[in-house]
Structures are given as structure tokens and as C-alpha cells.
From Swiss-Prot:
GO terms for biological process: translation. PANTHER family: MITOCHONDRIAL RIBOSOMAL PROTEIN S5 (PTHR48277:SF1). Part of the 30S ribosomal subunit. Contacts proteins S4 and S8. Residues 20-83 form the S5 DRBM domain. The N-terminal domain interacts with the head of the 30S subunit; the C-terminal domain interacts with the body and contacts protein S4. The interaction surface between S4 and S5 is involved in control of translational fidelity. Pfam families: Ribosomal_S5 (PF00333), Ribosomal_S5_C (PF03719). With S4 and S12 plays an important role in translational accuracy. It comes from the Bacteria. InterPro entries: Ribosomal_Su5_D2-typ_SF, Ribosomal_uS5, Ribosomal_uS5_bac-type, Ribosomal_uS5_C, Ribosomal_uS5_N, Ribosomal_uS5_N_CS, Ribsml_uS5_D2-typ_fold_subgr. This is Small ribosomal subunit protein uS5.
Length: 186
């Protein structure tokens, strides 16, 4: 009976997992020096998202690559953030993020521009569901720092309604000030 319950739970977990897309960003072989020599292991950096505005990243370490990837994927699913997207395809405004020596600049882009971003940032945007964005990495090219800096920038992304509420003005007034918005596009 316990086996049947476990199978049912696994099936439910698989259905929930199918809504997420995961991308392997980086695998690193690490060595631990012990008395008898070196013990090799692997560290994996994975980005997971639902392509609808939720995204997370995780880091996993294990003796085997598949186990490290599994651990990283589970860690990414546990620590996800929501990012408001404009028209479901791009960012609402330009934003900058930092982590350590890594610095990234993210800019909203017009429809059809595509994802113009390098390496680890591209994986974040693809799993997030962004279709049009221009991103530039300044500083460190370490994938861990780039991903964390990208997440720092995405955490500062705000919906115009939230910005209007924060400033104490009407949403329509804020939208009227935008030069690239015609009508009421969101």
C-alpha cells in the first residue's frame, strides 16, 4: 500500500515538473585532496522556469554529473521568483544588476528583436519566457556571478501599476508619459 502511495506521489511530481523548462548553464569538475590522492566530484548550475514569468536557479554538487544536475534542478525549483513581463514577451523597463564582480545591464526590446544576450543570461531569459531583450554583461564572466547578477536585476523589475502606486499617481498618467506606448498595451 505504501508503494502505491509513493507511485501516486511520483506521478503527481512528474506532472508538476512537466510545466518547467530547465537549462544546464555550467558543469565544473572539482577535486578534494585527501590522504590517498584526489577525489573528483562535479558541481552543476541549472536554471529552471515556466516560460510565463517564473524562474529560479540552483547549484548542486555530487560525485556523478546526473546527480549534481538533479540536485541543482531541485534547488532551482525551491527558490523561484516571479518577474512581471510586458506583453508576455519583454521587460517593462531597463534595469541593472550586480553580484560580486559581475554586473549586467538588461534593456527592454521591441517585438521581433529576439534574445540578444550571452551564455548564462540567455539561459535565464529562455526559461523565464522573455522573447525580446538586449542584455550586456559588464565585469566578471564567471557563470555563477552572471546568473546571480541577472537575478538581482530581475528582482528589481516592477510592473508599471506598482510604480504608479509607489509614486502616488494614476496608472494612466504613468502610461501617458511613456514614449513607446500607444494606447493601453501591457
Amino acid at each position: 500500500m505504501a508503494q502505491r502511495e509513493r507511485n501516486r506521489e511520483d506521478r503527481g511530481r512528474e506532472e508538476r515538473d512537466s510545466e518547467f523548462v530547465d537549462k544546464l548553464v555550467h558543469i565544473n569538475r572539482v577535486a578534494k585532496v585527501v590522504k590517498g590522492g584526489r577525489r573528483f566530484g562535479f558541481a552543476a548550475l541549472v536554471v529552471v522556469g515556466d516560460q510565463k514569468g517564473r524562474v529560479g536557479f540552483g547549484h548542486g554538487k555530487a560525485r556523478e554529473v546526473p546527480e549534481a544536475i538533479r540536485k541543482a534542478t531541485e534547488a532551482a525549483k525551491r527558490d523561484m521568483i516571479f518577474v512581471p513581463l510586458r506583453s508576455g514577451r519583454t521587460l517593462h523597463h531597463d534595469v541593472e544588476g550586480r553580484h560580486g564582480a559581475g554586473k549586467v545591464l538588461l534593456r527592454a526590446a521591441p517585438a521581433g528583436k529576439g534574445i540578444i544576450a550571452g551564455g548564462p543570461m540567455r539561459a535565464v531569459f529562455e526559461t523565464l519566457g522573455v522573447q525580446d531583450v538586449v542584455a550586456k554583461s559588464l565585469g566578471s564572466s564567471n557563470p555563477y556571478n552572471m546568473v546571480r547578477a541577472t537575478f538581482d536585476a530581475l528582482k528589481h523589475q516592477m510592473h508599471p501599476k506598482d510604480i504608479a502606486a509607489q509614486r502616488g499617481i494614476k496608472y494612466s498618467t504613468l502610461q501617458a508619459r511613456r514614449h513607446d506606448v500607444v494606447g493601453s498595451e501591457e
